[in-house]
């Protein structure tokens, strides 16, 4: 064989090999606009929320739109948000989701938690479990993520709805909180403010700005959540019963204009974040790697970045972020992250779809 031809073939082969080795992901569900949340059904099909108000079932490489959704208020950051299965979904069939709704008092909308069942391609047995009030025409800070603990309590987050100076620090008001309910929507008897006069009994923690990532740590059973700061001051927190997480009294962030709204980054009696980002990365979506699919990455926390369009692999030492490594750089605005039943990590990316993170 001519030496030049041989060398040309070798260069092409090495280039292709290098490309295949450096490929970080493969697209599993293409052509999604804003996959705000997704979850895996027992048959490994995927239930996906699109922020503009669609629920999609992806099965056998085919998308089917689910009918029977409640009326969804789409404004600013609000719309159809997270979705999660009951831990005993195989036994009871319950699906839980959060969305913005105009129901209730006042103009505009606010975050709502509903449960329902899937019958064919239709939602049935729908029941609102919680509706934050009052409604607001502001377009920001609806939250919202959902997580279940081992006792089947459901936790869900609602942002401060742009009412920074009233909502987060007042337990008689909704918004700027993480809530806990029983799986049927009733209030757990050991909720922290159940005996406080005038308090919203579903509140589990308060002093939050806009939590858009929440997950039960599979190694410790703690509730981990992250939230958006303003200009700087995005946070990761470990959520504890009845605790105050400081917003807006204490923050590492400043106003978007560059002015300060507080000189304090910590206050006695309020919880400090275990990690914060300045400048902001605009975090959304969260998952722990608990499978063996990624080797030494097991135990890492994954956080999506809307602003900088990557996934941060947070390497943990105890309850601290020791180091961050950027994955899927420039992939697009990362909205949601889940570990599938197969142990692989799946990432929802705006204007792309859902991708599978490939082990190296």
Predicted regions and their residues:
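Surface-exposed loop and turn segments in beta-propeller and other repeat-based domains
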Residues: 65-78, 126-142, 183-204, 247-278
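Loop-centered beta-sheet repeat module
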Residues: 172-181, 190-223
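Bacterial Sec-dependent N-terminal signal peptides
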Residues: 1-23
């Amino acid at each position: 064989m001519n030496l030049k031809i041989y060398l040309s073939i070798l260069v092409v082969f090495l280039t292709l090999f290098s490309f295949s080795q450096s490929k970080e992901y493969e697209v599993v569900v293409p052509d999604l606009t804003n996959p705000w949340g997704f979850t895996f059904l027992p048959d490994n099909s995927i239930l996906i929320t699109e922020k503009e108000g669609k629920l999609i079932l992806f099965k056998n490489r085919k998308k089917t739109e689910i009918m029977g959704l409640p009326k969804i208020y789409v404004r600013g950051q609000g719309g159809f948000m997270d979705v999660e299965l009951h831990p005993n979904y195989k036994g009871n069939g319950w699906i839980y989701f959060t969305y913005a709704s105009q129901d209730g008092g006042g103009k505009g909308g606010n975050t709502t938690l509903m449960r329902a069942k899937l019958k064919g391609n239709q939602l049935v047995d729908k029941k609102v479990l919680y509706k934050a009030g009052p409604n607001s025409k502001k377009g920001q800070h609806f939250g919202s993520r959902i997580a279940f603990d081992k006792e089947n309590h459901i936790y869900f987050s609602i942002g401060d709805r742009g009412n920074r100076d009233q909502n987060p620090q007042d337990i008689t008001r909704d918004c700027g909180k993480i809530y806990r309910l029983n799986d049927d929507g009733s209030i757990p008897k050991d909720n922290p403010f159940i005996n406080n006069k005038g308090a919203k009994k579903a509140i589990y923690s308060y002093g939050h700005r806009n939590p858009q990532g929440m997950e039960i740590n599979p190694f410790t059973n703690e509730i981990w959540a992250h939230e958006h700061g303003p200009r700087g001051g995005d946070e990761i927190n470990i959520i504890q019963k009845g605790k105050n997480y400081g917003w807006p009294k204490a923050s590492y962030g400043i106003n978007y204009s560059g002015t300060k709204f507080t000189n304090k980054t910590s206050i006695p009696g309020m919880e400090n974040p275990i990690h914060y980002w300045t400048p902001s990365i605009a975090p959304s979506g969260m998952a722990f790697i608990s499978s063996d699919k990624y080797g030494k990455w097991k135990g890492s926390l994954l956080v999506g970045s809307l602003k900088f369009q990557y996934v941060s692999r947070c390497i943990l030492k105890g309850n601290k972020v020791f180091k961050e490594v950027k994955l899927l750089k420039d992939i697009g605005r990362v909205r949601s992250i889940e570990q599938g039943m197969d142990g692989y990590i799946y990432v929802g990316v705006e204007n792309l779809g859902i991708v599978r993170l490939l082990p190296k």
